[in-house]
Amino acid sequence: MKKLSALLIFFLCATAMPAQSSLLRILSGLAKAGQAITLTDEQLAAAVKESVAAMDKKNTVCSASSAYTQRLKRLTKGMNAADGIKFNFKVYKTSEVNAFACPDGSVRVYSALMDALSDDELLGVLGHEIGHVALRHSKKSWQDALLRSAASDALGSFSDTWAEFSASSWSSLGESMISAKHSRHHERQADDYGYEFLKKCGRNPWAMGKAFKKLKSFSEKSGSTKYAKLLYAFSSHPDFDERIRRMRERAEEDGYSCH
């Protein structure tokens, strides 16, 4: 069994990335064998890419000529990568308010969020989301989700079930991850990353605090599902008031206006 498991691990790590259904079949077999499994950054990115592709297919992606895409392109000009992760940006045309960044570098922004925020505020939120990826906060969450999916295969490690792993399944996996909460420590780190991100973009980093103020006002609108996903992701501690206070203190200390 050890030799077989070692062979499977070697195959998983050394070959070109197979179709994602094959990856899940292999992971399922290893999980059933009780083996500890880790994924390389490249393997994880390939699996996440499949999930993001399914979400892109499920959602309405704004065309390259749309005002939303052009605005995002203008704001993110020159933002090609961070910490070795290459970005690709798209806008979803939707009434929901959200944005997310994934370990493969995919960054997706919802049009309603763009409607709600100024350029600087939007960059702050993007910086926060990119921070979770650049600081590797998202990596373990996605890896754990993939391994849970593999372990849940009840029909055998090489059954046709994984070969038929559907686009809707990939999409559901992705959606569960983009709304996942992070720890208090990770949220503070991502806030600080967003703050520094704004400074590097030549913007007033207090826009990070202003974005939090708007998110707080959204959270006070009872009965609305429009902001549900974004607010759920941002609702873990620290709370909005603390985040706003921290951003204000940092901005004032750095000599920026906080109006």
Task: Say what each PLM segment does.
Residues 4-13:
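Sec-dependent N-terminal signal peptides
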Residues 15-19:
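Sec/Tat signal peptide C-region and signal peptidase I cleavage site
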